Every structure is written in C-alpha cells, then in structure tokens.
Amino acid sequence: MLNFFYVKYKSLFKIIAILTFNILCYCRTVHSISKNDYTISNNLKLYPYSFVNFRPSPEMSQILKKKKLDSSSSEDFIPTKRITTLEELKNYERLEERTKVTITKDKIPLFAKNDMFRNTVRNPLNSIDYYKNDESDIRTYILKRWDLLPSPLRDLITNESIDHSTVTHKIKYEDITTEEAFKLVVNDDIGVMVGFETVGHIAHLNVPEERSSIKKLIAKIIIDKHKHIKTVINKRSEVQNQFRTMDIELLAGEENYIANLVIFVILMSFSFQMKQSLLVDMFAGAGPFAIYASKKGCSVLANDLNPIGATYMKRNIEINKVHDLVKVFNMDGREFLIDVIKKNKILDKKTLECDGMALKASGKVHLIMNLPKIAIEFLGNLVMKHRFSDTLIGLADNIEEENMRKLLVHCYCFSASEEYEKEIEQRLYKSIGRKLPEYTITHVRGVSPKKQMYCIEFECPISILRGNKE
C-alpha cells in the first residue's frame, strides 16, 4: 500500500521533501578538514545518496552544490572592453538607458494588482531601483527592461503614472550580475562558462591553463557576488600521492581551509534491511559515507591510509555521536582486507562482533571502494597470491560456505572512453583475472568534458571469496 502511494505521488513527495528539509529525514552531521592536506573537512549536511546502491541518486543530482555559471540571464550585455586588473574591476562603471516610472503613493495597490512588482522586483531579468521619499506621495522606479513588461502593464503605466521616460542610469560593478561580471574578464568564443564547487565557505576552482592570467579576477567576482564565500582556492595539480592530496593555491579571501557544511537529506532511497548490513569503506577519507550509513543504523568498518584523514574521521564520528557504530582504521587497503576483514572472519554469519561492535548475522556486507583513479585495479586484491607459493588467498577461504555473508561490491572508476562499458570490462578482467557473471555500470557524474565517473556494482562470486581458480 505504501509503495502504491509512493509511486503514484512520487513527484509530490519530492516537492514536499525539498520544501520541508528538517521535517523529512533530517540529518545533521559534521565533517572536518585538514589545512595542509585538503582532505576537506566539513560540518556535513549529507546530500542525497541512495544507500541501497551506495551512489548519488541521479534523480536528485541537481541538488548537489555545484555552481555552473553562464550568460543566459544577461544575453543582451556585450562588454565594449575587457577588464584585466582588479583595480579596473573594482572601479567599473557604465551608462545604460533605463525606464523611469513615477507614480503616486495611492496608486501602489493598483500597480501591485496588475503584477508590476512581480514583473520587476521579483524578476531577475528586469531588476528595479526604487526611490522613496517618506515625506512625499511620489514613488519613483527605474526599470531595467521596459520591453520585457507585459503589454497590459505597459498600458497601465502609460495611462496611470505621473511620468514614464527614458533616462541614463549609471551601473557600477556592485550592480551587475555574476554572469555580466564574468563577461567583462573572460574573452573567448565559447561563451562564459566558469564552474566551481563549494564546501561551506570555500569555493574550489579548476582553472584551465588558458585562463590562468585571469584566475584572480574570476576569484574576485566569486567572492564579491556570493556573500557566503570567504575563501577561493584553485587546484594546481591532480590528486597524486598515496594520501590523495592536491596542490592548491589561495586566489582570494581568507586563508581558512577548515570548512563547516551542514547537509540535509532531502530525499533518499532507504531499505530498512540496511540496519542489518555492514558497510566496509576501503577509502573512507574523513568519513562522509561512513557517517551517513551509521546515521541510518548501519555498522561500519572505515579505513583510510592517510593518518590525517583517519584523525578527522574519528573526530567527525565523535561529533556526530556514532562512535558505537563506526570503527576507524588507518591502514594500507591490502593489509586492511587481510588483517581486519579476513582474520576477523567478517564474512562469517557466526561473527557477531568486531572490536566491540555488534554485527547482525543476517546482514549483507557492502564493500565500497570510492577511489576512482585506482579502485578497479585494487579489486585484484580480493584474490591474492600466497607470498611463498602460487596458492590463491580469498577473503572467505577460512569460512564454511553455508555460513558466508553476501558481499556486495560498489566500485567507483573513471573512464574517458566512448565505449566505456567495453573499456571497464577489460580493466575488470585484467584486475581480477576472470569474467564476472553479472554486474552493472551506472553513470555517476561528469568529471570533465572528456572524463566520466561510473559505479560498478556486483555480488562477489563465491569462487573469488574462497580463492578458487576460475
């Protein structure tokens, strides 16, 4: 019955969920971040992840905090000259023709009834400047676009206003939109396309080489036009070392890299059987997946090689009061599989405890590998060779087959190939040395115009878990 109502009124449920954040599935978590490391720490408000499938919900991807700016709201603005310095940007001025409308105070209800203010004050394409003198019965409005007003409203202004005329209006830098400001500094033939992501008060850019000369102008615009942004940084290199850190530079604002971000769960897919499950997070970072899953009652074993990331994960777990459900490890992933998962017989239904944390006998084990650059290649460690022989070692070769828990693998990866399914299949075969009987590949998001992120999901075959040759 509940499923019937959900399917029938799915769109309505989404709208209600978006409008009432903390009524529906409110979740507040806190995430911290290291300055030197850029393992970004947040005071987290978790965005919608489907923890049935452990990946971002495609239907809700538009809610993620990513800003893509274009010139769609300022198509009529063409700058006469490009700005190249911060001083020029700060002192920018131009003159534009605007429409001045003057009415008497007693006419305000009439104009309001005919949607004058809905078509001006509330319309970003037709902004309004309002001049009011409390000692006078006169009200003056400067309209940006007379031609955008509905014809009946234009007729009303013509007939009922004291005056409507064209005036020259001074426009300053603080008056223009973000898109117009970008048009002043970006000079190319592909339009204004400046993207950035936000984490709390931090805006994170990936400025391409061709725009490096104007990166500080871009940062200045972002920090001026988005009042919640206090710090703008640029990633100067790819994530490159074993700790997955990156080289960043401060472009504008405060040198404060500790971000606080509260994320509300707006809409999510959740199975109540999830409370019986165990999440094994191989590359947990500062703990976003681990904390979210534990908030839903899931037991979690979370590992990260980076000691700073593991430290912040422990701190976030304490802040979010889920320490009874999350165990943190700071180990190499291969050692984690052998010394924690295998030696503790985590895949054995008879194992009901790990380091003081209770495990459910009936629960499945979800292995999440969110390190897209190398996760596929790391899958090969599910089957390892004995160091002194060619014998294969499986994670569950020390467990009776009838007592084995199911292991569901969620492996994230990148691909730049148009035939990504074929390319991923080849990489899977090369990594684990056999064909998987069944798996799914789901598109997660676009990383760049030529690179996409995918999630590979499959139930790990018993032959792999027991270390059997194909």
From Swiss-Prot:
Its EC number is 2.1.1.228. Keywords: Cytoplasm, Methyltransferase, Mitochondrion, Nucleus, S-adenosyl-L-methionine, Transferase, tRNA processing. It comes from Theileria parva. Belongs to the class I-like SAM-binding methyltransferase superfamily. TRM5/TYW2 family. GO terms for cellular component: mitochondrial matrix; nucleus. Monomer. It is an enzyme of class 2 (transferase). One of its GO terms (biological process) is tRNA N1-guanine methylation. This is tRNA (guanine(37)-N(1))-methyltransferase. It catalyses: guanosine(37) in tRNA + S-adenosyl-L-methionine = N(1)-methylguanosine(37) in tRNA + S-adenosyl-L-homocysteine + H(+). InterPro entries: MeTrfase_TRM5/TYW2, SAM-dependent_MTases_sf, TRM5-TYW2-like_MTfase, TRM5/TYW2-like_N, tRNA_Gua_MeTrfase_euk. It comes from the Eukaryota.
